Each structure stands twice: as C-alpha cells, then as structure tokens.
Amino acid sequence: MKRLLGYLKEHLCVTILAPLFKMLEASFELFVPLVVASMIDVGIGHHDIGYLWKMGGLLILLGIIGFSFSITAQYFAARSAVYTGKSMRSDLFAHMNQFSYQEIDQVGTSTLINRMSNDINQVQNGVNMFLRLFLRSPFVVFGAMFMAFTVDHKAAISFVFTITALAVVVGLILWITMPMYKKVQKQVDGVLKSTRENLLGIRVIRAFNRQRSEEENFRLQSGQLYNKQIHVGKISALLNPLTYMIINLGIIAILWSGGKQVDLGYLTQGQIIALINYMSQILVELVKLANLLIILSRAFASLDRVDQIFALEPSMKETGKTDIEEKKDTPILEFKDTSFVYHGARKETIHPFDFAVKEGETIGVIGGTGSGKSTFVSLIARLYDVTSGRILYRGVDEKELKPEFIRGKIGFVPQKASLFEGSLRDNMKWGKEDATDEEIYQALDIAQAREFVDQKEQGLDFR
C-alpha cells in the first residue's frame, strides 16, 4: 500500500482534483429532486407554465454543470491511474530484470507475466474507480438522507433503516467474496503455468507419450478455476436482487407513510416524489459502492501479488570486480567440488565434481536428455549460482566478479534461438553495438546463418 501511495504522490494534483470534481458533481445532483418537487407542486399544481419552463431550464443547467464536472473528474482519475500503472509497470520490469534464473524459476515465468500485465491492470482500474467513487458514493448516500430529513423527518426515518440494511447486506457479501478473489487470481496463475509448460515442453511430452496425462492436469487446473469463479459469481450475484428488494421495501414504506401525510395535508405530492428520488439515488450509489469494493478487493489482491515480486531480492547483486590479473598457468575456467540443485527439486541436477579448462583447449560435453548439460553451461555464465563448491574464472571465484563482467567474457548460445523486437540488424548488434554490416555478415557466415538472412527480401532490415 505504501508503494501505491508513493506513485499517487508523484501526481498529487490530478489525484486530488479527481474526487474533488466528483464531489461537486454530486452536490448538483442532490438538488435535482427538490427542483422536480417544486415543478410538481407549483408548476403542475398551479398550472404555471412559465414556472415549469424556468425550473426545466434550471434542471438542464444543473445537468450540464454536473456533466462537465463529471467529465473533468473522469479525465483526472484516468490520468492518475494510467500514470500509476505506467510507473509501477516500469519499476516492476526493471526489478525483474535483476533476477537471476533462480528467482525466475522460483516464481515462474507465467506468474511474472501475469503480474506484469493482468495484476497491474487490476491495480490501475482500482485506482481509477477509487478516485471516482470513494468520496462521491458515501457523499450522495448521506447527502440524500440529510436532504430527505429536510423534506420530512418522519418519512425520512425509513432511510436510516434502509441504509443500515443495505450496508449489512453489502458488507456481508464483500466479507465472503474478497478472500475468494485472491484464490481465483492464484488459480489463474496455475492455468497459465500449466499452459506455458505444455507449450514449451511439447517435444519432451510427446517423446515420453505424456499427452493424456498433461491434458488431464490442464483439465483439472481449468476445472478448479471454473468452480471458484462460479462460486464467487453466485455469491456476488445476490447483491443486485437483495439491494433492489431492500430499496423497494423502503419506497413502499415512504409511499405508505407519506400517503397518509399527503391526505392530512402535511406533505405534498412533489415532496413524496423527492423522497422516492432520494431513495433511488441511494440505491444507485450503494450498488456503485459495492461494485467499487469488489473492484478494490481484486485490486488489493493484485497489489499484494505485485508487492511480493518487489519484495523478492535478487540473489545475484550487480556488484563485484570488473578487472582481474591474468596468470599464464591458471586455468581459464575451473569447477571445484561444484554441485547444483534446482529450486524445489529433490535431487541434485549436477553432483559434486571437479573440472578445469586451460586457455586454448576445446572441450565437448555429451550426455542424454536431462543429464545437466544446459545447466552446466548456465553455471559457467553464472545464470545460476552453484549450490555448493566454487567456479573460478582465471583463478577468481565468479561470485567475487560482477555478473556483467563474467557474461561479457563468455559467449553463451542457448539451445533455442530467439529474436527480439526490432530488425535482424538490431538483434545482431546485441553482441556489439557499433558493429558494421560487414562484421555482422562475417559473424553470420561463421555461425552458418547467412542463408537465413539472404532468404529475406529486406535482409538485415527484416523485422
């Protein structure tokens, strides 16, 4: 929550102006039932056409002013929410870029993507709705009750009971559903994780003939999400019928008690209409407030998930030596009693071993699928930190060196080639920012990838 407030403080002006203009709009809205009441009692009651035109013009004026304030408030609220979402997303992306493979494996790529996109969108939507309604709805509810007491305090007593009953119903439904939304969000992560694992591991799944098992697992994950969404949806669906029932009972109470007072001459027909209009305003605003609280419950659940990522500290710090003394007799790379275990795994992927490579040597590492070849290479580039033992680069423990320095000295080619956004030339310049086209083509020839580029009409400009 403190983090969110920090983002809102960066745009404090628009954050304050949004609810302020909404309050002004609500103030004009509260006068509308009184104007309508006077039109009924005076204009229609006395057949005063001029008065009706005058009051009709006043209604139009109130509507135009209220609409202007509403549009202005929506603009400021949307601007504050978008700024907040943009800043939070940028900071989260920068924080995630500091993660090693260990943190990415621990949290899960699908979860990180979900929190970067869906969760921050939920927070952004929550901020937008909060700024628009968190002051307006309570102001209209209590303002309508106050205005009802100015019309007739006896008839307005039903407002107190109605608002109390509505508050109990809304509060009870929210108390039940808010924890459920957190479970739904967590289950969405499970479905995304299952989908991603199947897409990325499709070759292995087919190789071991595990399609049916994976289909059952996905069906289970999807079914659990469906059941949770249906369950919370059924409870939330009770909100509208219960609130409308309570409001209609309140209106019946007003008509019953007010009708008697009209017959006795204590109330006018216009005043009864005004009381009913105020009751309708309360209904609309309480439904809005309930929906706001539901949106906020989702937003807070998403904010908590985003904060969990911010709270996760990278295991590899971007600190260390960036220069070392090169010794002739020292191996360029050396593993000393090195072992590695993936997060959550029961067994070691790489058992303790010793290994050394001297400058100029060419060594191939062979092994079956899952034997640890890719893990071994990842440890060299320090994409992971070893579980035990040490890895030395030119006699210096890699943990004492800055990760950027290590990766600048080691060429790492992943098993699966990936092209990032931009042209082929932009991708090739990742290795050398000032590379010329001749140098790029020379590198493509060495990598035997020149044919792939030549097949494209745009050549290096292909996107």
Predicted regions, residues:
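Helix-loop-helix
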Residues: 48-52, 147-161, 231-305, 309-310
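ABC transporter nucleotide-binding domain catalytic core, centered on the Walker B motif
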Residues: 201, 263, 394
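Hydrophobic alpha-helical transmembrane segments of ABC transporter permease domains
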Residues: 20, 28-32, 69, 117-165, ...
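Transmembrane helix-loop-helix hairpins at lipid-water interfaces of multipass membrane proteins
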Residues: 9-72, 76, 149-154, 265, ...
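An intracellular "coupling" helix at the cytosolic face of ABC transporter transmembrane type-1 domains
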Residues: 10-13, 77, 98-102, 118-127, ...
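Short intracellular "coupling" helices and adjacent cytoplasmic loop segments at the cytosolic face
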Residues: 46-47, 82, 90-114, 118-120, ...
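Juxtamembrane helix-loop junctions of ABC transporter transmembrane domains
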Residues: 1, 20-21, 25-37, 41, ...
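ABC-type nucleotide-binding domain
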Residues: 326-463
